[in-house]
Amino acid sequence: MAQLLVIVKILPKGTEVDLDEMMEGLKGGLKGGIVLRRYAKEPLAFGLHFVKAEFILEDKEGQNDALEATVRSAKGVSEYEVLNMSRMSVDMK
């Protein structure tokens, strides 16, 4: 089965949220073959940062909805937005 690479933008509830702690909690809640590939903190405005994260998931029904539900239910998460989604090729690094 093919795999998808989903790049998302995750906004915290405020500047007091520890983004690394938020992502560790989110990573622990992932299931069903969804994997956090990597993430980076990016500045947004006025001291607020967001997380740009890459997830790998199977190309089957319900996976994207499961990812969104997991991210939105993680402690400290305010908003979730899909920036890009593409099918992974064999030589993708």
Curated annotation (Swiss-Prot):
UniProt KW Plastid keyword: no
Keyword Protein biosynthesis attached: yes
Domain of life: Archaea
Keyword annotations: Elongation factor, Protein biosynthesis
UniProt GO molecular function: translation elongation factor activity
Name of a matching Pfam family: EF1_GNE
NCBIfam families recorded: PRK00435.1 (NF001670)
Record protein name field: Elongation factor 1-beta
Organism in which the protein naturally occurs: Cenarchaeum symbiosum (strain A)
High-level lineage: Archaea, Nitrososphaerota, Candidatus Cenarchaeales, Candidatus Cenarchaeaceae, Candidatus Cenarchaeum
